[in-house]
Amino acid sequence: MAQENSLLNRPASQTSAHFKIIEIAKSFPETADTLLLDKYLTNEEAASARVFRVYRATPPHYHATCDEYLYVLSGRGTFWMEDPSKIAEFEAGQLLFFKRGTVHALPEILEQPVVFLSVDTPRRDPKDVVFVDPAAGTPETFVQAV
């Protein structure tokens, strides 16, 4: 809990908090066993907010229960949403958005660390990761909470 509170500008209450997003982004380790590591900032019924670092390319997948807004804090890579033939690059300062059920992937990481600030509406259950190819992974191999 001490580390969690050290990443806040002021102590969290039941109704508000002020997070040091860049410090949280820098706190992720250099390597991970899963494709990404995830830090929940808020987890309300209407929405959740997270910071996560992507360590390896992510295979095509979707989220069945939430829309996702991804603000790129650092790094560069490629992504596609809906159509794998329409690959584009992402970089810090960009916002990616997709509705629930939209298949998406990050096929290539061009510059580490790739870190996103995510807002999910409604809240995202950590198990809500559905791989297009079930052999590509499970929620447990996809993400680990820190």
Which residues does each predicted region cover?
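A short, N-terminal "cap"/entry segment at the start of jelly-roll beta-barrel domains
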Residues: 1-51, 59-60, 131-146
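Conserved hydrophobic/aromatic beta-strand scaffold that supports enzyme active sites
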Residues: 40, 49-53, 69, 87, ...
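Short histidine-centered beta-strand/loop micro-motifs
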Residues: 40, 52, 59-64, 81, ...
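Structural motif
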Residues: 48, 76-78, 103, 113
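Short, conserved beta-strand element in jelly-roll/cupin
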Residues: 53-55, 64-79, 119-122
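A generic "binding-loop/recognition-motif" signal
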Residues: 56, 65, 102-103, 112
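A short beta-strand-loop-beta hairpin characteristic of the jelly-roll/cupin
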Residues: 69-92, 129-131
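Conserved metal-binding segment of the jelly-roll/cupin
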Residues: 90-109, 119-121
